[in-house]
UniProtKB/Swiss-Prot annotation:
Membrane topology: Peripheral membrane protein
Catalyzed reactions: 2 reduced [2Fe-2S]-[ferredoxin] + NADP(+) + H(+) = 2 oxidized [2Fe-2S]-[ferredoxin] + NADPH
Species this protein is from: Vicia faba (Broad bean)
Binding site for FAD: R142, L143, Y144, S145, C163, V164, K165, Y169, V180, C181, S182, T221
Purpose of the protein: May play a key role in regulating the relative amounts of cyclic and non-cyclic electron flow to meet the demands of the plant for ATP and reducing power.
Ranges of residues in domain FAD-binding FR-type: 84-206
Biological process terms in GO annotation: photosynthesis
Binding-site residues for NADP(+), renumbered to this chain: S145, K165, T221, V253, P254, S283, R284, K293, G322, L323, E361
Gene it is expressed from: PETH
Name of the protein described by the UniProt record: Ferredoxin--NADP reductase, chloroplastic
Amino acid sequence: MAAAVTAAVSLPYSNSTSLPIRTSIVAPERLVFKKVSLNSVSISGRVGTIRAQITTEAEAPVTKVVKHSKKQDEGIVVNKFKPKEPYVGRCLLNTKITGDDAPGETWHMVFTTEGEVPYREGQSIGIVPDGIDKNGKPHKLRLYSIASSAIGDFGDSKTVSLCVKRLVYTNDAGEVVKGVCSNFLCDLKPGSEVKITGPVGKEMLMPKDPNATVIMLGTGTGIAPFRSFLWKMFFEKHEDYKFNGLAWLFLGVPTSSSLLYKEEFEKMKEKAPENFRLDFAVSREQVNDKGEKMYIQTRMAQYAEELWELLKKDNTFVYMCGLKGMEKGIDDIMVSIRPKDGIDWIEYKRTLKKAEQWNVEVY
C-alpha cells in the first residue's frame, strides 16, 4: 500500500542547499522513500516545504521453524493417566534379581496394561501406592523408569516392567525407615492391583538413527531404561527398525551380586559382538591400576580417549541414569583430558545437550 505524505521542514539559513534525501527508518512496516525531483532549495529565512512520497510495504510473514527431534518421538503419548484417574493393572510376576549377600534388594516386576498405557523406551510411569499418609491423604505417586521395551517382556504390547530397589534405612534417631512406594512394589504378589499413571518423559527417548553410537551410563536401578533400549536393539525384530550402530553399556554397582540383568546382557554380547560392548564397574571388588575403587567413572577413564573421539561424532548419543553423584565424576574425567584439544568440556557438553546428544536422568 502506498501513501503520499507532505512534510514541512524548518531548515537553517543557507545561501544554497542541495538536499539529497537518504533516510533509514526502523518501524513495524518497512518504509521506502522515493526521491522527488528537487535540485536545490532556496532559503530566505523562511520555512521550506519538501514533498516526499512514502511507500509502506508490509513485512513478510514470519515462518515458524519446526525443530525436528533426533529421537524417536513421533506419536509419543504423555500423561494419559493422572493420579486421580490412574490405570489399574495387575502384577503378573515379581522377582528378586539381586543375590542374598547384595547390599539391598532389587526386584523386577511385570504389570498388565492390556495395551492401554502406550509407553516408549526411555519413558517412565508413576505408581500410586495403596494406603494413606500420616495426614490421612492418599500417598503421592512415585516415578520409575520403565525397564521393558515398548512391546513388553512378553512381546505382546500388553505389559510394562519396572526395576525397583527396596528402600530401607536408619534415620538419625535410630529408627528404621521404609520407603513407602518401593516397599509396596517389592511386596506385591501376583494378582495384586497396582495404580499406574503416565507415561511421562521425553529426555531419555532412543535416537532415530539405527546407525548411531549409543553410550549408556547407569548405576544400580538406573539400568532400567537401558534394558528397554537393548531389548529393542538385540532381542526383538521390527519391520521399521534394525540397529546397526554401536551400543556401549557401562554399569556401576557395589558388588557382583548386585549386577542386574547380567545374563541377559551377556547373551546380547554373544549375539551381536560387533554392535554391543559391555563394561561393569564393581566398586567394592575391583580397583584400577592405581588401587582406586572401580566406580563407573573410574572404568570410563580407562577408555577416555576412545570415548572422546566418539563424542566428536554427530551421531553419538550419551544417556546417563542413576545416582546423581556419577555426573560430577564423569565431568572430572572429561575435563582432565580435554586440554589436549583445547576444548572446554563443560561448554562442549552444553553443545551436546542442545543437539540432544547428552541426556541425563539422575536422582
